[in-house]
Protein backbone atom coordinates (compact mmCIF):
# COMPACT_ATOMS: atom_id res chain seq x y z
CA UNK A 1 0.00 0.00 0.00
CA UNK A 2 1.21 3.50 -0.85
CA UNK A 3 1.40 5.20 2.53
CA UNK A 4 0.96 8.59 0.84
CA UNK A 5 -2.69 7.70 0.27
CA UNK A 6 -3.45 6.62 3.84
CA UNK A 7 -5.75 8.75 6.00
CA UNK A 8 -3.07 8.97 8.69
CA UNK A 9 -0.56 10.44 6.26
CA UNK A 10 -3.06 12.94 4.91
CA UNK A 11 -4.05 14.09 8.39
CA UNK A 12 -0.42 14.55 9.45
CA UNK A 13 0.51 16.62 6.42
CA UNK A 14 -2.74 18.50 5.91
CA UNK A 15 -2.28 22.26 5.94
CA UNK A 16 -4.69 25.01 6.87
CA UNK A 17 -5.34 27.87 4.41
CA UNK A 18 -2.48 29.77 6.06
CA UNK A 19 -0.09 26.88 5.35
CA UNK A 20 0.15 25.59 8.92
CA UNK A 21 0.07 21.89 9.75
CA UNK A 22 -2.67 20.66 12.05
CA UNK A 23 -1.94 20.43 15.76
CA UNK A 24 -1.08 16.91 16.87
CA UNK A 25 -4.15 16.90 19.12
CA UNK A 26 -6.37 17.66 16.12
CA UNK A 27 -4.71 14.89 14.10
CA UNK A 28 -5.28 12.43 16.94
CA UNK A 29 -8.95 13.38 17.19
CA UNK A 30 -9.47 13.00 13.44
CA UNK A 31 -7.81 9.57 13.42
CA UNK A 32 -10.05 8.49 16.29
CA UNK A 33 -13.05 9.82 14.38
CA UNK A 34 -12.20 7.26 11.70
CA UNK A 35 -11.37 4.38 14.01
CA UNK A 36 -14.39 4.69 16.31
CA UNK A 37 -17.11 4.02 13.70
CA UNK A 38 -15.09 1.18 12.17
CA UNK A 39 -14.79 -0.56 15.53
CA UNK A 40 -18.38 0.28 16.47
CA UNK A 41 -19.84 -1.21 13.31
CA UNK A 42 -17.66 -4.30 13.69
CA UNK A 43 -19.19 -4.83 17.15
CA UNK A 44 -22.71 -4.40 15.80
CA UNK A 45 -22.03 -6.82 12.93
CA UNK A 46 -20.87 -9.47 15.41
CA UNK A 47 -24.09 -9.03 17.38
CA UNK A 48 -26.17 -9.16 14.17
CA UNK A 49 -24.66 -12.58 13.45
CA UNK A 50 -25.39 -13.63 17.03
CA UNK A 51 -28.99 -12.39 16.77
CA UNK A 52 -29.51 -14.36 13.56
CA UNK A 53 -28.21 -17.44 15.38
CA UNK A 54 -30.16 -16.95 18.62
CA UNK A 55 -33.38 -15.52 17.18
CA UNK A 56 -33.49 -16.40 13.48
CA UNK A 57 -36.35 -14.85 11.48
CA UNK A 58 -38.81 -17.47 10.34
CA UNK A 59 -38.93 -16.27 6.73
CA UNK A 60 -37.72 -13.62 4.32
CA UNK A 61 -37.95 -10.14 5.79
CA UNK A 62 -39.76 -7.15 4.37
CA UNK A 63 -37.84 -3.88 4.38
CA UNK A 64 -39.69 -2.77 7.50
CA UNK A 65 -39.05 -6.10 9.24
CA UNK A 66 -35.39 -5.96 8.25
CA UNK A 67 -35.02 -2.50 9.77
CA UNK A 68 -36.88 -3.63 12.88
CA UNK A 69 -34.60 -6.66 13.32
CA UNK A 70 -31.54 -4.41 13.17
CA UNK A 71 -33.04 -1.90 15.60
CA UNK A 72 -33.92 -4.67 18.04
CA UNK A 73 -30.34 -5.94 17.83
CA UNK A 74 -29.14 -2.47 18.74
CA UNK A 75 -31.61 -2.27 21.61
CA UNK A 76 -31.12 -5.76 23.01
CA UNK A 77 -27.36 -6.37 22.90
CA UNK A 78 -24.78 -4.35 24.84
CA UNK A 79 -22.90 -1.90 22.67
CA UNK A 80 -21.52 0.82 24.88
CA UNK A 81 -22.82 0.97 28.46
CA UNK A 82 -23.00 4.70 29.02
CA UNK A 83 -22.22 8.18 27.78
CA UNK A 84 -20.50 10.86 29.85
CA UNK A 85 -21.40 14.52 30.26
CA UNK A 86 -20.44 17.41 32.50
CA UNK A 87 -23.16 19.57 34.04
CA UNK A 88 -23.10 23.10 32.57
CA UNK A 89 -25.26 24.84 35.17
CA UNK A 90 -26.82 23.88 38.51
CA UNK A 91 -30.29 22.37 38.16
CA UNK A 92 -32.75 20.04 39.86
CA UNK A 93 -34.44 17.14 38.07
CA UNK A 94 -37.05 14.94 39.75
CA UNK A 95 -35.63 15.74 43.16
CA UNK A 96 -31.99 15.15 42.19
CA UNK A 97 -29.52 18.02 42.50
CA UNK A 98 -27.01 18.44 39.67
CA UNK A 99 -24.18 20.84 40.43
CA UNK A 100 -22.15 22.62 37.78
CA UNK A 101 -19.10 20.67 36.52
CA UNK A 102 -20.35 17.37 38.00
CA UNK A 103 -19.42 14.40 35.80
CA UNK A 104 -22.56 12.38 35.01
CA UNK A 105 -23.27 9.08 33.25
CA UNK A 106 -26.27 8.20 31.08
CA UNK A 107 -27.08 4.47 31.26
CA UNK A 108 -27.62 3.49 27.61
CA UNK A 109 -28.08 -0.25 28.12
CA UNK A 110 -30.34 0.24 31.13
CA UNK A 111 -32.50 2.76 29.28
CA UNK A 112 -32.87 0.36 26.35
CA UNK A 113 -34.07 -2.32 28.81
CA UNK A 114 -36.21 -0.16 31.09
CA UNK A 115 -39.46 -2.04 31.86
CA UNK A 116 -41.47 1.19 31.89
CA UNK A 117 -40.45 1.89 28.30
CA UNK A 118 -40.28 -1.61 26.84
CA UNK A 119 -42.62 -4.57 26.98
CA UNK A 120 -40.72 -7.72 27.98
CA UNK A 121 -37.40 -5.85 27.62
CA UNK A 122 -35.14 -8.84 28.23
CA UNK A 123 -36.61 -10.80 25.31
CA UNK A 124 -35.36 -10.33 21.76
CA UNK A 125 -38.36 -9.56 19.56
CA UNK A 126 -37.28 -9.00 15.97
CA UNK A 127 -40.53 -7.29 14.97
CA UNK A 128 -40.62 -4.98 17.99
CA UNK A 129 -39.94 -1.86 15.92
CA UNK A 130 -42.45 -2.53 13.14
CA UNK A 131 -44.85 0.44 13.24
CA UNK A 132 -43.13 1.56 16.44
CA UNK A 133 -43.08 5.23 17.43
CA UNK A 134 -40.35 5.60 20.03
CA UNK A 135 -39.57 8.80 21.87
CA UNK A 136 -36.09 10.27 21.24
CA UNK A 137 -34.84 9.36 24.72
CA UNK A 138 -36.29 5.85 25.06
CA UNK A 139 -34.23 4.14 22.32
CA UNK A 140 -30.66 5.37 22.75
CA UNK A 141 -28.03 2.81 21.70
CA UNK A 142 -25.94 5.64 20.24
CA UNK A 143 -27.13 8.54 22.35
CA UNK A 144 -30.47 10.29 22.67
CA UNK A 145 -32.32 13.31 21.45
CA UNK A 146 -32.07 14.90 18.04
CA UNK A 147 -29.02 14.78 15.78
CA UNK A 148 -29.21 18.50 15.00
CA UNK A 149 -29.78 19.81 18.52
CA UNK A 150 -28.63 17.03 20.86
CA UNK A 151 -26.00 14.34 21.25
CA UNK A 152 -27.48 11.59 19.11
CA UNK A 153 -24.81 10.06 16.88
CA UNK A 154 -24.87 11.68 13.44
CA UNK A 155 -23.77 8.39 11.87
CA UNK A 156 -26.62 6.34 13.33
CA UNK A 157 -28.50 6.17 10.01
CA UNK A 158 -25.36 4.88 8.29
CA UNK A 159 -24.91 2.23 10.97
CA UNK A 160 -28.47 1.06 10.39
CA UNK A 161 -27.89 0.79 6.63
CA UNK A 162 -24.71 -1.23 7.20
CA UNK A 163 -26.52 -3.60 9.55
CA UNK A 164 -29.39 -4.08 7.10
CA UNK A 165 -26.89 -4.99 4.39
CA UNK A 166 -25.23 -7.39 6.82
CA UNK A 167 -28.49 -9.19 7.61
CA UNK A 168 -29.31 -9.47 3.90
CA UNK A 169 -25.83 -10.81 3.16
CA UNK A 170 -25.86 -13.42 5.94
CA UNK A 171 -29.42 -14.55 5.21
CA UNK A 172 -29.47 -14.47 1.42
CA UNK A 173 -26.01 -14.18 -0.09
CA UNK A 174 -24.12 -16.94 1.73
CA UNK A 175 -24.66 -20.12 3.69
CA UNK A 176 -22.50 -21.07 6.66
CA UNK A 177 -22.30 -23.10 9.84
CA UNK A 178 -21.33 -21.96 13.31
CA UNK A 179 -19.06 -24.55 14.96
CA UNK A 180 -19.27 -25.14 18.69
CA UNK A 181 -18.03 -22.01 20.44
CA UNK A 182 -18.70 -19.72 23.37
CA UNK A 183 -21.28 -17.16 22.24
CA UNK A 184 -21.88 -15.70 25.69
CA UNK A 185 -21.00 -12.06 26.29
CA UNK A 186 -20.25 -9.87 29.27
CA UNK A 187 -22.17 -6.84 30.48
CA UNK A 188 -19.05 -5.44 32.16
CA UNK A 189 -16.58 -5.41 29.25
CA UNK A 190 -16.14 -2.41 26.95
CA UNK A 191 -16.82 -3.13 24.21
CA UNK A 192 -18.71 -6.35 24.85
CA UNK A 193 -18.38 -9.12 22.25
CA UNK A 194 -19.25 -12.82 22.04
CA UNK A 195 -16.47 -14.67 23.86
CA UNK A 196 -15.48 -16.63 20.74
CA UNK A 197 -16.28 -13.66 18.52
CA UNK A 198 -18.24 -15.26 15.65
CA UNK A 199 -16.44 -18.17 14.00
CA UNK A 200 -17.97 -19.59 10.81
CA UNK A 201 -17.19 -22.65 8.75
CA UNK A 202 -18.38 -24.16 5.46
CA UNK A 203 -18.99 -20.66 4.11
CA UNK A 204 -20.39 -20.71 0.60
CA UNK A 205 -21.68 -17.99 -1.68
CA UNK A 206 -25.19 -18.47 -3.02
CA UNK A 207 -25.16 -18.29 -6.82
CA UNK A 208 -27.66 -18.96 -9.56
CA UNK A 209 -25.86 -22.26 -10.16
CA UNK A 210 -25.90 -23.31 -6.54
CA UNK A 211 -23.41 -22.89 -3.71
CA UNK A 212 -19.76 -22.08 -4.30
CA UNK A 213 -17.06 -22.16 -1.62
CA UNK A 214 -16.06 -18.74 -0.36
CA UNK A 215 -12.51 -17.65 -1.12
Question: What are these language model-derived features?
Answer:
Residues 107-134:
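Conserved cytochrome P450 K-helix/beta-meander segment immediately N-terminal to the heme-binding cysteine loop
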Residues 17-33, 127-148:
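Short, hydrophobic/aliphatic alpha-helical segments
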Residues 28-32, 39-63, 154-174:
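Cytochrome P450 catalytic-core helices
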Residues 1-42:
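Conserved cytochrome P450 catalytic core segment spanning the I/J/K helices
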Residues 61-96, 105:
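Conserved cytochrome P450 K-helix E-x-x-R motif and the immediately C-terminal K′/meander segment
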Residues 186-215:
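Charge-rich, low-complexity terminal tails
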Residues 117, 130-195:
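Cytochrome P450 heme-thiolate "Cys pocket" and heme-binding signature region
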